Amino acid sequence: MIHTNLKRKFSCFVLVFLLFAIICVWKKGSDYEALTLQAKVFQMPKSQEKVAVGPAPQAVFSNSKQDPKEGVQILSYPRVTAKVKPQPSLQVWDKDSTYSKLNPRLLKIWRNYLNMNKYKVSYKGPGPGVKFSVEALRCHLRDHVNVSMIEATDFPFNTTEWEGYLPKENFRTKAGPWHKCAVVSSAGSLKNSQLGREIDNHDAVLRFNGAPTDNFQQDVGTKTTIRLVNSQLVTTEKRFLKDSLYTEGILILWDPSVYHADIPQWYQKPDYNFFETYKSYRRLHPSQPFYILKPQMPWELWDIIQEISPDLIQPNPPSSGMLGIIIMMTLCDQVDIYEFLPSKRKTDVCYYHQKFFDSACTMGAYHPLLFEKNMVKHLNEGTDEDIYLFGKATLSGFRNNRC
């Protein structure tokens, strides 16, 4: 019996102790909630935290004072200095690149071309390694590179043999002037770029050789205003005469001459004898604008590339890509160039529409491509971020130059 009473007393004691503990915990929780609520009242809102680390009206950071209109006290907070995380440098084209960047195979090719000198180059101008500011180089290009087309008054195109074949309308009345233009390379790094819509938003778009838009619209767009083709394609591509790819926009054909040859000299010895194919095309498509670039222009451009380059460059004409860039700088206020300077998608795949691998497509073998890219990087007025993410370089055209 005594044992049972002790058991009951002990149970009551435990219950009282638990009840007391619960009351204490509840009271402490209430006090904590009150303190938390009070802290929330004076906590800085996130929107004001953002203001505190950037520019803000001066009143926010001055001592507390009364708003004379509202009679409400304005709380002030101390300025918070944001710690800026250092940005890693973006790996983009170095405008001071030299042949030391080439692999042994491309170095050997470069030396072979120097020895061959197929086009009898004998450069006697200034340089190498002449330095120009961006604006001075633009002026130099504008004044010394004449972008013009063969006309029916040029001998021997003024003979009966050529009567009716060349376009009657002057190139400059047919093309431009435009405000914002795009030059779209054929580089493999354009694949999966998703740049199509951006490219098509330009006033005019220049493409090269047989680079298609069908099946690649998302990456390269659909618009073609000018297509620059080389004489090798015109003479060897069987589909050239009938493929609809070559009936959209304005066609410009170029063929390299011997160094600084005039039109009659070049006509006697073209690099590729495209003349009969050109006539056949004009008979099939008489309304299609199809111009022939004067052969002096590529060598005028080559002279300037050699002048500013620290090394001897290949004695071969500039690439179609570089010629197209200069053509559009003549016609447009602003030229956006896509994947001439490689982006983060850089690849040894030469073309976005073919599976052909060769590092020469980026670094150059036949053409002085490495130094062409140096020139474009020097002229670039866009950001390294644009180059890295989109492969986009932005150049000003010649029309707005203050020379």
Swiss-Prot record:
Single GO cellular component term: Golgi cisterna membrane
Record's InterPro entries? Glyco_trans_29 (IPR001675), GT29-like_sf (IPR038578), Sialyl_trans (IPR012163)
Q: Could you list the residue ranges that cross the membrane?
A: 10-26
Give the E.C. number(s). 2.4.3.1
Q: What GO molecular-function term can you cite, just one?
A: beta-galactoside alpha-2,6-sialyltransferase activity
Q: Name one GO biological process term.
A: N-acetylneuraminate metabolic process
What's the main place this protein lives? Golgi
Pfam families from the xrefs?
Glyco_transf_29
What's this protein's family per the entry? Belongs to the glycosyltransferase 29 family.
Subunit structure and binding partners: Monomer and homodimer.
Q: What is this protein called?
A: Beta-galactoside alpha-2,6-sialyltransferase 1
Annotated organism of origin: Mus musculus
